[in-house]
Structures are given as C-alpha cells and as structure tokens.
Amino acid sequence: TEVAQAQLIAIVKDGALIESAGKGDKVQLIVNQTPFYGESGGQVGDIGNIRFENGEANIVDTKRSVGVFVHFAEINSGILSVNEAVELEVEGLRRSSVRANHSATHLLHEALRNKLGNHVAQRGSLNAADRLRFDFSHSKALTKDELVAVQSSVNFYIRQNTEVSTRVMSPDDARKLGATALFGEKYGEEVRVVSMGYQQKSGKGLDGNGYSLELCGGTHVKRTGDIGAFLILSDGASSSGVRRIEALTGEAALDHLAKQQNYLTEIALELKTSLFDILSKVKSLTAERKSLVNELSQLRKDMALAEVAGESDELKSEDLSGVNFLV
C-alpha cells in the first residue's frame, strides 16, 4: 500500500523530543503505522508527504532503526502536534522505479552465479530510483562476452514476465528450497523469501523449477515484466576480490540507449558513413593518421639532415700561421 492513516507518536528536532513543529521546521516523525519503506538491505527509503488537519509536510527520507521507522520531514504549512491524526502517502512513481531496480538486482545476482559460478555472492548493493549498483565476489573483470551474456539473461527473465512471489517461512525451510541468503546477514526465526523466474528442473522453489530465490525484506515488482528493460553501464573493481556492476532499468535504460543512438548517429554523419561502419571507418582513419605521423617524422629527419649537409657545404678553410682552420 502507498497510503495509510496513522497517529503521530513522536516528533524529534535537533536530537530532542518536541510537542509540535511548524512551517520550515526539519524534523523526524514516528507514527504508529506507516506505508513507507525504511532504508535497509541496500534499498533507499521512501519519500512522499504527510497531511494533517491544518497543514502538510514533505517526507524527504525514511530510515529504519531497531525496528522503528523514522520519517525525515520538512513542514510546509500548519502546526503538527504529537498524537495528531495524519495521512501518509508514498511517492508512487519513485517507489515503482526503486522496486524495478531491486527486482532486477535479484535477477542480476542469479545471472552472475549461473555465468561465473557459485562463488559469486552479494557483497553490497544500492537500489535507488535512478540506478542500481551491485557488488559481488569475483576476482577479475568480466569479459565483453560475459557482460553481454549476463545482460541478456536478465532481460530474458524480464520478458518471461513471471509473477514475483513472497513467502514467510523458517530459515531452514528457505534453505531447503534453495534460497540464497546474504553474506553476513543475521536472520530470525522467520524469513521472507522472494522468488521470480522459471527455470525448468533447477531444483529451486516449491516445484523445483524456480530461478531466483533470495531472503529479502525489500519491495519488488508484481511481475518481472514490470522491470521493463535492463542495461549494464559498467563493471569495475570495488575492492580486492570484489567487482561492482552499475545498471539501469525501465525508462532510464531506454532513455540511455536512445541517447547513445543519437550520439552514434551524429558521429556517423560527421564521418560520412553508416552506423554499422563507424568502427571500420575509425580504424581506417586511425591507420591513416599513424601513416601520416610516420611520414611527417621522417620528413623532419630528412630536413634536419639536409640542413646539416648545407652547412657543411658552406664551410671554408683559412690559413692562420701555417695551420688550416674550417670556418
């Protein structure tokens, strides 16, 4: 849900509890129930707004601390008081983008494990509205072919458009289903398992045909097709033995591809060639430039030798006290 009625339990300003806050105040709000997701597990916190009897406030971030959701707010109008009834509303479009990036991260994790090996494990992540970042254990850079294969795999399961399901169970039951746990995470008596994708006879899931199963408390799309598209931007070293992939999904991925297309079209026009002949044209121009540089270098050497030879021809001999000198 993205909208909820609640009661304001506490207001914090500059580290101290206060009874009320007015226009312009930057405060932290705690309510008895909330539709907002608090930053955790690599997923950013929700933003949105909170409305009350005589005013409203923007929620610019949400964090979770010891099970308590803290809403970082800026009061736009009115006076907000403790125990007041409020209505909270999450910014839906932003949450949708975050959900898409989080679900794509799960598909990316599984694609990397399938392509590179089971040594691949998550070492960190960021699931924001505009991009995703995924750190994983691997000792060397991915080749161009590996990156293409991983990206293609993620897009395959996006197009598969399977339902994304969540189930709460014991950690032991989750392990029996083949769910992946995050390195270093501590789990309680119950865990939430998020599954997506169909892979025949994978041995994962209730029917043994699951693709990605992970222990996760974050928000996700309803179907993998809701992700839209997946585009890898870069693969680099995060630290020793850890690689980092940055990627885009949905409209952001399509916009990036459109910009690339426009840029390549401009280059092709400048080079007076087609899009698919740009590389051969650049290689030809590079070879031509190298040849010209070599010719110019040789010409300069020849000119220098000619100058030396010319100076030698102009040398004259003079006799001083019976000794010949070249001048």
For the regions a language model picked out, list residue spans one by one:
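A glycine- and charged-residue-rich anion-binding loop/surface
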Residues: 1-327
